[in-house]
Protein backbone atom coordinates (compact mmCIF):
# COMPACT_ATOMS: atom_id res chain seq x y z
CA UNK A 1 0.00 0.00 0.00
CA UNK A 2 1.52 3.33 -1.08
CA UNK A 3 0.94 5.89 1.62
CA UNK A 4 0.47 9.65 1.19
CA UNK A 5 2.59 11.09 4.04
CA UNK A 6 1.48 14.48 5.39
CA UNK A 7 3.69 16.48 7.75
CA UNK A 8 2.33 19.42 9.75
CA UNK A 9 5.01 21.74 11.21
CA UNK A 10 3.36 23.84 13.90
CA UNK A 11 4.87 26.84 15.66
CA UNK A 12 4.30 26.44 19.43
CA UNK A 13 6.41 29.43 20.52
CA UNK A 14 5.27 31.77 23.30
CA UNK A 15 3.68 34.25 20.89
CA UNK A 16 1.14 31.57 19.92
CA UNK A 17 -0.15 31.39 23.52
CA UNK A 18 -3.84 31.98 24.16
CA UNK A 19 -6.35 32.11 21.31
CA UNK A 20 -3.92 31.14 18.48
CA UNK A 21 -2.72 27.83 19.98
CA UNK A 22 -6.27 26.90 21.05
CA UNK A 23 -7.43 27.64 17.49
CA UNK A 24 -4.64 25.41 16.11
CA UNK A 25 -5.68 22.53 18.41
CA UNK A 26 -9.32 22.89 17.36
CA UNK A 27 -8.32 23.25 13.70
CA UNK A 28 -6.30 20.03 13.70
CA UNK A 29 -9.15 18.15 15.40
CA UNK A 30 -11.69 19.42 12.86
CA UNK A 31 -9.28 18.44 10.07
CA UNK A 32 -8.86 14.89 11.41
CA UNK A 33 -12.65 14.44 11.82
CA UNK A 34 -13.23 15.64 8.28
CA UNK A 35 -10.53 13.38 6.79
CA UNK A 36 -11.88 10.36 8.66
CA UNK A 37 -15.09 10.79 6.64
CA UNK A 38 -13.16 10.60 3.36
CA UNK A 39 -12.64 6.91 2.42
CA UNK A 40 -9.76 7.66 0.03
CA UNK A 41 -7.93 9.76 2.66
CA UNK A 42 -8.51 7.07 5.31
CA UNK A 43 -6.91 4.54 2.98
CA UNK A 44 -3.85 6.55 1.90
CA UNK A 45 -3.15 9.58 4.12
CA UNK A 46 -0.76 9.23 7.06
CA UNK A 47 -0.23 12.23 9.30
CA UNK A 48 2.67 13.45 11.44
CA UNK A 49 2.96 16.55 13.62
CA UNK A 50 6.26 18.31 14.31
CA UNK A 51 6.16 21.18 16.80
CA UNK A 52 8.81 23.84 17.26
CA UNK A 53 9.54 26.47 19.92
CA UNK A 54 12.92 26.74 21.71
CA UNK A 55 13.72 23.41 20.05
CA UNK A 56 11.81 21.04 17.74
CA UNK A 57 10.48 17.52 18.07
CA UNK A 58 8.20 15.07 16.27
CA UNK A 59 5.13 15.09 18.50
CA UNK A 60 3.20 12.51 16.46
CA UNK A 61 5.07 10.03 14.22
CA UNK A 62 3.57 9.19 10.81
CA UNK A 63 0.22 7.63 11.77
CA UNK A 64 -2.87 6.45 9.90
CA UNK A 65 -5.98 8.61 10.42
CA UNK A 66 -7.87 5.95 12.40
CA UNK A 67 -5.08 5.68 15.01
CA UNK A 68 -4.19 9.41 15.14
CA UNK A 69 -4.40 10.92 18.63
CA UNK A 70 -4.27 14.66 19.13
CA UNK A 71 -1.23 15.71 21.19
CA UNK A 72 -1.42 18.45 23.80
CA UNK A 73 0.11 21.60 22.31
CA UNK A 74 1.62 24.13 24.73
CA UNK A 75 2.88 27.50 23.49
CA UNK A 76 6.15 28.61 25.10
CA UNK A 77 9.67 29.68 24.12
CA UNK A 78 11.26 30.92 20.88
CA UNK A 79 10.93 29.96 17.19
CA UNK A 80 13.36 27.21 16.08
CA UNK A 81 12.19 26.88 12.49
CA UNK A 82 15.60 25.66 11.27
CA UNK A 83 15.61 22.87 13.85
CA UNK A 84 12.06 21.92 12.76
CA UNK A 85 13.23 21.60 9.14
CA UNK A 86 16.08 19.33 10.31
CA UNK A 87 13.66 17.15 12.31
CA UNK A 88 11.34 17.02 9.29
CA UNK A 89 14.18 16.01 6.95
CA UNK A 90 15.22 13.24 9.32
CA UNK A 91 11.62 11.97 9.68
CA UNK A 92 11.16 11.88 5.90
CA UNK A 93 14.40 9.94 5.50
CA UNK A 94 13.43 7.35 8.13
CA UNK A 95 9.62 7.10 7.75
CA UNK A 96 8.87 7.49 4.04
CA UNK A 97 9.41 4.34 1.97
CA UNK A 98 11.53 5.04 -1.11
CA UNK A 99 10.72 3.55 -4.50
CA UNK A 100 13.24 0.92 -5.63
CA UNK A 101 13.43 -1.54 -8.53
CA UNK A 102 11.55 -4.08 -6.39
CA UNK A 103 9.01 -1.94 -4.58
CA UNK A 104 6.87 1.12 -5.24
CA UNK A 105 7.50 3.43 -2.31
CA UNK A 106 5.21 5.99 -0.69
CA UNK A 107 3.98 9.07 -2.52
CA UNK A 108 6.04 12.22 -2.05
CA UNK A 109 5.09 13.89 1.27
CA UNK A 110 2.84 16.93 1.54
CA UNK A 111 4.22 19.48 4.01
CA UNK A 112 2.26 22.29 5.71
CA UNK A 113 4.21 24.77 7.85
CA UNK A 114 2.50 27.30 10.13
CA UNK A 115 4.47 29.99 11.98
CA UNK A 116 3.66 33.37 13.49
CA UNK A 117 7.16 34.77 13.96
CA UNK A 118 10.72 35.26 12.80
CA UNK A 119 13.00 32.22 13.15
CA UNK A 120 15.30 32.57 16.17
CA UNK A 121 17.81 29.90 15.13
CA UNK A 122 20.05 29.17 12.15
CA UNK A 123 17.12 28.43 9.84
CA UNK A 124 19.29 28.37 6.71
CA UNK A 125 21.22 25.27 7.81
CA UNK A 126 17.85 23.58 8.40
CA UNK A 127 16.71 24.70 4.95
CA UNK A 128 19.86 23.28 3.34
CA UNK A 129 19.14 19.90 4.92
CA UNK A 130 15.49 20.05 3.88
CA UNK A 131 16.48 20.69 0.25
CA UNK A 132 18.16 17.26 0.20
CA UNK A 133 14.96 15.28 0.80
CA UNK A 134 12.28 14.47 -1.76
CA UNK A 135 8.96 16.13 -1.02
CA UNK A 136 5.80 16.88 -2.97
CA UNK A 137 3.92 20.11 -2.37
CA UNK A 138 5.10 22.34 0.50
CA UNK A 139 2.78 25.11 1.76
CA UNK A 140 3.97 27.65 4.34
CA UNK A 141 1.47 29.74 6.28
CA UNK A 142 2.46 33.09 7.79
CA UNK A 143 0.09 33.60 10.73
CA UNK A 144 -0.29 37.22 11.85
CA UNK A 145 1.81 40.27 11.03
CA UNK A 146 4.93 39.03 12.88
CA UNK A 147 5.67 36.15 10.49
CA UNK A 148 8.48 36.65 7.98
CA UNK A 149 7.14 35.78 4.52
CA UNK A 150 10.55 36.39 2.91
CA UNK A 151 12.01 33.49 4.96
CA UNK A 152 9.04 31.26 4.08
CA UNK A 153 9.41 32.12 0.39
CA UNK A 154 12.91 30.62 0.50
CA UNK A 155 11.45 27.36 1.79
CA UNK A 156 8.63 27.16 -0.79
CA UNK A 157 6.95 29.19 -3.53
CA UNK A 158 3.56 28.35 -2.01
CA UNK A 159 3.11 30.83 0.86
CA UNK A 160 -0.21 31.99 2.31
CA UNK A 161 -0.89 34.50 5.07
CA UNK A 162 -3.73 34.87 7.55
CA UNK A 163 -4.66 36.46 10.86
CA UNK A 164 -4.30 34.52 14.12
CA UNK A 165 -7.95 34.68 15.19
CA UNK A 166 -9.96 31.50 15.74
CA UNK A 167 -11.98 31.75 12.50
CA UNK A 168 -8.99 32.31 10.20
CA UNK A 169 -6.95 29.46 11.69
CA UNK A 170 -9.98 27.16 11.51
CA UNK A 171 -10.38 28.10 7.82
CA UNK A 172 -6.72 27.26 7.19
CA UNK A 173 -7.05 23.75 8.61
CA UNK A 174 -10.32 23.16 6.71
CA UNK A 175 -8.44 24.08 3.54
CA UNK A 176 -5.53 21.79 4.50
CA UNK A 177 -8.07 19.01 5.03
CA UNK A 178 -9.62 19.64 1.59
CA UNK A 179 -6.14 19.73 0.02
CA UNK A 180 -5.21 16.37 1.59
CA UNK A 181 -8.55 15.01 0.35
CA UNK A 182 -7.87 16.18 -3.23
CA UNK A 183 -4.31 14.79 -3.09
CA UNK A 184 -5.40 11.38 -1.80
CA UNK A 185 -8.15 11.17 -4.47
CA UNK A 186 -5.67 12.11 -7.20
CA UNK A 187 -3.12 9.45 -6.21
CA UNK A 188 -5.88 6.88 -5.68
CA UNK A 189 -7.74 7.42 -8.95
CA UNK A 190 -5.11 8.52 -11.45
CA UNK A 191 -1.82 7.66 -9.74
CA UNK A 192 -0.61 11.26 -10.08
CA UNK A 193 0.51 13.69 -7.42
CA UNK A 194 -0.55 17.27 -6.69
CA UNK A 195 2.32 19.51 -7.75
CA UNK A 196 1.37 22.92 -6.36
CA UNK A 197 -1.22 25.36 -5.02
CA UNK A 198 -2.92 25.58 -8.43
CA UNK A 199 -4.02 21.93 -8.12
CA UNK A 200 -5.39 22.35 -4.61
CA UNK A 201 -8.86 23.65 -3.72
CA UNK A 202 -9.16 27.47 -3.93
CA UNK A 203 -8.06 28.98 -0.59
CA UNK A 204 -10.86 30.51 1.55
CA UNK A 205 -11.26 34.30 1.82
CA UNK A 206 -9.26 34.34 5.09
CA UNK A 207 -6.13 33.08 3.29
CA UNK A 208 -4.09 35.44 1.15
CA UNK A 209 -1.61 33.99 -1.34
CA UNK A 210 1.77 35.72 -0.93
CA UNK A 211 3.35 36.41 -4.32
Language-model segments: which ranges?
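VWA/integrin I-like adhesion module and closely mimicked acidic/polar interface patches used
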Residues: 22, 99, 117-155
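Mixed-charge (Asp/Glu-Lys/Arg
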Residues: 13, 31, 126-131, 192
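Short glycine-/polar-rich loops that comprise or flank the Walker A/P-loop
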Residues: 4, 107-108, 134-137, 156-157
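Short, flexible, mixed-charge acidic loops at enzyme active sites
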Residues: 59-67
Amino acid sequence: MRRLPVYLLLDTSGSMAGEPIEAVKNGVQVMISSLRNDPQAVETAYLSIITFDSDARQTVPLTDLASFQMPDLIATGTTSLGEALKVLSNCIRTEVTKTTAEVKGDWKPLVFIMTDGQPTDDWQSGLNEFKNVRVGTVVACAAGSGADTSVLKQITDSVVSLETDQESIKSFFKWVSASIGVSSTKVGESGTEVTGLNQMPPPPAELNIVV
